[in-house]
Amino acid sequence: MIFTLEVIGFNIESCTIAQLAGAHRIELCDNPGEGGTTPSYGFIKTARKNLQIDLFPIIRPRGGDFLYFDEEFEVMKADVKICKELECDAVVIGMLYSDGTVDKKRCSQLVELAYPLGVTFHRAFDRVADPLKALEDIIDVGCERILTSGLQPNALDGAEMIASLIKQANERIIIMPGSGVRSDNIIELAKKTGATEFHSSARMYINSNMTYTNAAMKE
C-alpha cells in the first residue's frame, strides 16, 4: 500500500527530521500544548527555506474552541496572506458556529483568499454536531482535505466514522485520519477506513542540553 504521510512540525529540527525520514509534507504549528497554533513569520520563512517537501502552516490564532471573534478572523486573514507571500503549499483552517456547524461564510473567505494555495480543514471537524452535514459544507466551501479522528480521541477509535466519511465523500474531498496514528497501526487503520493519507505527530521528548537549571523554576 502506498500512503501519503503528513507530519506535524513544532520546531525546525522536527521538520528536518521528518523530511529526512520520508514524510511527504509538514503541517507547521506552534504551541503543542494548545493543540497547535499559527507559527510565527520567522518559523514559516525558515521552514520554507529548509524544506523541499510541502509545507502546510495551520491558521489558528489561539488554543481553545473554534468560534472566533471578528478581530481574530482579521488575524487569520493576515496570516493566510503571509503564507502566500512565503510560498507555502497550503494552509490549514477550521471555524465553527456556536451550534457546532461549520462557519461556511468565513471559511469560504479564507479559501478564496488562500487561492491558489490548497486548504485543509483541521480537527475542528471533530467538534461538529453533525459530521455528515459538515462534510458536505466543507466540500461546498472548497477545501481539498479534512483532518479527523472520526470524532473520537484517536483515529482507531473513530475508524468506523472515518470509513463512513470516506464513503460519503466519494473522492470529492480527501479524508485524512489523524490522532494516534503510528507506524504500528497505520496498516490496520488503512484497512478499516480505506484512507490513503495519514497525519501523525510522531512526537518524542528529548532532554535539554542545559547544564544549569534553576531548581526553583519548575513552571
Report each predicted region and the residues it spans.
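Active-site beta->alpha loop and helix N-cap motifs at the rims of alpha/beta catalytic domains
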Residues: 12-14, 23-25, 37, 43-104, ...
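Catalytic cores of alpha/beta
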Residues: 10-21, 67-81, 126-141, 162-175, ...
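Glycine-rich phosphate-binding active-site loops on the catalytic face of alpha/beta enzymes
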Residues: 24-37, 82-98, 143-156, 193-215
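Hydrophobic, well-structured mid-protein blocks that either form specific transmembrane helices
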Residues: 87-142
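Hydrophobic faces of well-ordered beta-strands that scaffold small-molecule active sites
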Residues: 3-7, 26-28, 47, 55-59, ...
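C-terminal helical cap(s) of enzyme catalytic domains, especially alpha/beta-barrels
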Residues: 44, 159-168, 190-193, 207-219
